[in-house]
Curated annotation (Swiss-Prot):
Name assigned to this protein: Probable arginine--tRNA ligase, mitochondrial
Molecular function (Gene Ontology), one example: ATP binding
Alphabetical keyword list: Acetylation, Aminoacyl-tRNA synthetase, ATP-binding, Ligase, Membrane, Mitochondrion, Nucleotide-binding, Protein biosynthesis, Transit peptide
SMART domains named in the record: DALR_1 (SM00836)
PROSITE patterns: AA_TRNA_LIGASE_I
Length: 578
């Protein structure tokens, strides 16, 4: 695997540079493949060496690269050494490259790339990831969908790297909307509708009561009183609220299952209605709580009255706010999990909110506030189903399934499937996830169903098609050829390009683990699929001599394995037929 070759190169460099091999590992990177020319397999960035050097005179880097290359020697691992633009390049012995990469992919299976030396020495951590977090009775909007798939990716990757991950869905299950919802259900609610479709019915009630409250002050007052009863622990009010919450969570679990997403804990703002009062007392005891003329309580994070740094933590009637409950939740999670890192995945509109929450934790004396991290993402515009704006996650999933079924029906090569609905949903979800993950998470983008479902080009449909096609090859030829293979049979440019690309998988995983951007993995998998498409046309298995056919089948099997591994990390279930 790449790290074995990296170490061999690092050991030779360490003797010349008088540096420990460990210091050189991350400076040696696999070279991205080129369609125009054959490239080396690894390169050493001379810039990065000079950054490690305390001598800042920085002589001509190209001269330095040439001098260094002249001191190095080819050996059983490295067959050629050359210089590039500010780099020293290394070509690996071709037979060794073929044998090592294919053996490693087959032996490591789903762990390929994750055992790399790039990750060795990194401590195993306990990581809390809070994501999805819809509001009960309100729309499950596109922001919640993005939070769900991004949070799931981060949790998947961290878990694959051996960290202990706790996935939390922090529901919006408290606040004034429940005053409206409780009052609304007493006025317009139906028990049968609630039991049969809780999310839909609660949303309908919520929309109706909001209209009524806008026109009728007595309804607005009743809603306010209902929420105050909830805050005071009234048994009847709490019983109704609990029913709404339990039925909603049951429905969420069912729908998340279709997405392939699960949570270790369904938490919510309601858990912290009492603990938020303790937070207010602590803020007051530290002299941080200020009262306004309106009777609200605020914290001045600037210390000099800067209006942009004022954070409201209590309403005039003494009830808690979102920020107060987030503070209580963070403190509770540290007590419960003693986490090393806590990651919040929400849209970029909440950036200031989390900055203030983390800052308040710090001035309250919690040094671990530095372990809290916000992963923000941009806005998606224009995602609509045929029924109109997205209201529920299930609307999106049903739309995906319907559109993909229609696409599959219109394509002549579509196979006969045991469960076309399931396949359509998996392919459609891959399409949705790849469209979302192709760019920077922070970027806004305009959604297009037509672009999502293109079977050609850089789409999720193309990834699924490639996986299914490679699986079909294994089904057709696998039994007879998957024994020992001759590495000398994989020296064509198409084979070498694939092997070079497989070398890079650990670096791509490392990049994504550092910046939480799935685009590195997406770009890698799309390139791998394009390479496989070219190889599928030129590297025939049928009618080839057995040892050639066997070697090629091993190569395609390795591609399919790595493709499946990457897709699963992104939250995509690979399909075997489509």
């Amino acid at each position: 695997m790449a790290c074995g070759f990296r170490r061999a190169i690092a050991c030779q460099l360490s003797r010349v540079l008088n540096l420990p091999p460990e210091n050189l590992i991350t400076s040696i990177s696999a070279v991205p493949i080129s369609q125009k020319e054959e490239v080396a397999d690894f390169q050493l960035s001379v810039d990065s060496l000079l950054e490690k050097d305390n001598d800042h005179s920085r002589p001509d880097i190209q001269v330095q690269a040439k001098r260094l290359a002249e001191k190095l020697r080819c050996d059983t691992v490295v067959s050629e050494i050359s210089t590039g633009q500010r780099t020293v390049n290394f070509k690996i012995n071709r037979e060794l490259l073929t044998k090592t990469v294919l053996q490693q992919v087959i032996e490591d299976g789903s762990k390929y790339g994750l055992k790399s030396e790039l990750f060795s020495g990194l401590p195993q951590k306990k990581i809390v990831v809070e994501f999805s977090s819809p509001n009960v009775a309100k729309k499950f909007h596109v922001g919640h969908l993005r939070s769900t798939i991004i949070g799931n990716f981060i949790a998947n990757l961290k878990e694959a790297l051996g960290h202990q991950v706790i996935r939390i869905n922090y529901l919006g299950d408290w606040g004034m909307q429940f005053g409206l919802l409780g009052t609304g259900f007493q006025l317009f609610g139906y028990e049968e509708k609630l039991q049969s479709n809780p999310l839909q019915h609660l949303f309908e009630v919520y929309v109706q009561v909001n209209k009524e409250a806008a026109d009728d002050k007595s309804v607005a007052k009743a809603a306010q009183e209902f929420f105050q009863r909830l805050e005071l622990g009234d048994v009847q009010a709490l019983s109704l609220w609990q029913k709404f919450r339990d039925l909603s969570i049951e429905e969420y679990i069912r729908v998340y299952k279709r997405l392939g997403v699960y949570f270790d804990e369904y938490s919510g703002e309601s858990f912290y209605r009492e603990k938020s009062q303790e937070v207010l007392k602590l803020l007051e005891s530290k002299g941080l709580l200020l009262r306004t003329i309106k009777g609200t309580a605020v914290v001045d994070l600037s210390g000099n009255g800067d209006p942009s740094s004022i954070c409201t933590v209590m309403r005039s009637d003494g009830t808690s706010l979102y920020a107060t409950r987030d503070l209580a939740a963070a403190i509770d999670r540290m007590d419960k999990y003693n986490f090393d890192t806590m990651i919040y995945v929400t849209d970029k509109g909440q950036k200031k909110h989390f900055q203030q929450v983390f800052q308040m934790l710090k001035i309250m004396g919690y040094d671990w506030a530095e372990r809290c991290q916000h992963v923000p993402f941009g806005v998606v515009q224009g995602m609509k189903t045929r029924r109109g704006d997205v209201t529920f996650l299930e609307d999106v999933l049903n739309e995906i399934q319907l559109r993909m079924l229609q696409n599959m029906a219109s394509i002549k090569t579509t196979k006969e499937l045991k469960n076309p609905q399931e396949t359509a949903e998996r392919v459609g979800l891959a399409a949705l996830i790849i469209q979302d993950f192709k760019g920077l998470l922070l970027s806004d983008y305009k959604f297009s169903w037509d672009r999502v479902f293109q079977s050609r080009g850089d789409t999720g449909v193309f990834l699924q098609y490639t996986h299914a096609r490679l699986h079909s090859l294994e089904e057709t030829f696998g039994c007879g050829y998957l024994n020992d293979f001759n590495t000398a049979c994989l020296q064509e440019p198409q084979s070498v390009s694939i092997l070079q690309h497989l070398l890079r998988f650990d670096e791509v995983l490392y990049k994504s683990s550092q910046d939480f951007q799935p685009r590195h993995i997406v770009s890698y998998l799309l390139t791998l699929s394009h390479l496989a498409a070219v190889a599928h046309k030129t590297l025939q298995i049928k009618d080839s001599p057995p040892e050639v056919a066997g070697a090629r089948l091993h190569l395609f099997k390795a591609v399919r394995s790595v493709l499946a591994n990457g897709m699963k990390l992104l939250g995509i279930t690979p399909v075997c037929r489509m």
